[in-house]
């Protein structure tokens, strides 16, 4: 969806709002100039009947980038959902659902090449193609608070229960968050580039805990229930970069009053001036 807002008689500000379509969206620049890129990561997931579980909200990132006419950039907007399916831009290979558990929120990323979701840029030779990322929030099972995504370091998950795995920690700039282990459960993955970590119970295959939020580096999960960490954001590919965690005030992507974290699917807003 795009729309134009008049600024004065000589210039107008054009904005493109990109929502979650679970696919890569291409934007081709209509003019040469400076473009403002804003991204909101998605909230983490929870199980529908877990009324005391609070997944982490998604973070916010913004910056500017000078682009030529007819340049193409590619947007992956993160997904959230309250059940156990894997979520777009935070989908580990070979898994379609976290049965018994829940997924972390998907990151929202903008890149200069179309390689697919953020995880496919993990090779260092591809990471320079990433312009900006907003981290997704950590998932939560039973009760507690999933870690907010966003910022240079995502927030850790929090729960007061002693009968679950330790909470997952937030993703950082060069390493993913740590997935909380528990006796009898397997840590399948700690957080890593583009993906939140997770674990499961091996003698009941498919009984998962909560997954960390996606991000530049994903948050750690919790192998048995519990609260996962949020994914980190990234702004080194843009000028004037700024990022906020999902527990902080940030602009509303739909143009309303400021919000405290993004509590739904992710968004991307691209804006530029036309002479």
Predicted regions and their residues:
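Beta-strand-rich interaction surfaces with strong enrichment in secreted/lumenal proteins
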Residues: 16-17, 25-26, 50-52, 62-65
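Surface-exposed ligand/attachment interfaces on beta-rich extracellular proteins
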Residues: 20-29, 197-200
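Extended extracellular/luminal ectodomain segments enriched in beta-structured repeat modules
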Residues: 29-36, 68-72
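Catalytic nucleophile loop of clan PA
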Residues: 95-122, 145-153, 175, 192-235
């Amino acid at each position: 969806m795009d729309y134009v807002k008049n600024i004065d008689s000589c210039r107008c500000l054009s904005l493109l709002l990109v929502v979650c379509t679970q696919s890569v969206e291409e934007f081709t620049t209509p003019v040469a100039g400076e473009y403002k890129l804003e991204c909101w990561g998605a909230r983490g997931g929870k199980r529908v009947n877990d009324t005391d579980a609070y997944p982490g909200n998604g973070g916010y990132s913004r910056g500017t980038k000078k682009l030529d006419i007819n340049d193409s950039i590619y947007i992956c907007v993160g997904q959230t959902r309250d059940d156990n399916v894997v979520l777009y831009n935070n989908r580990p290979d070979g898994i379609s659902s976290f049965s018994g558990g829940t997924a972390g929120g998907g990151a929202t990323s903008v890149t200069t090449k179309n390689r697919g979701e953020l995880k496919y840029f993990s090779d260092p030779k591809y990471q320079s193609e990433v312009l900006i990322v907003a981290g997704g929030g950590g998932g939560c099972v039973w009760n507690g608070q999933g870690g907010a995504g966003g910022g240079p370091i995502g927030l850790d998950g929090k729960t007061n229960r002693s009968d679950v795995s330790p909470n997952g920690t937030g993703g950082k700039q060069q390493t993913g968050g740590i997935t909380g282990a528990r006796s009898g459960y397997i840590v399948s993955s700690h957080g890593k580039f583009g993906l939140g970590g997770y674990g499961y119970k091996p003698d009941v295959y498919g009984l998962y805990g909560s997954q960390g939020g996606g991000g530049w580096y994903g948050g750690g999960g919790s192998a048995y229930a519990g609260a996962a960490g949020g994914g980190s954001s990234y702004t080194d590919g843009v000028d004037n970069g700024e990022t906020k965690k999902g527990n902080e005030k940030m602009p509303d992507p739909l143009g309303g009053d400021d919000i405290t974290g993004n509590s739904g699917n992710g968004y991307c807003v691209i804006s530029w001036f036309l002479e």
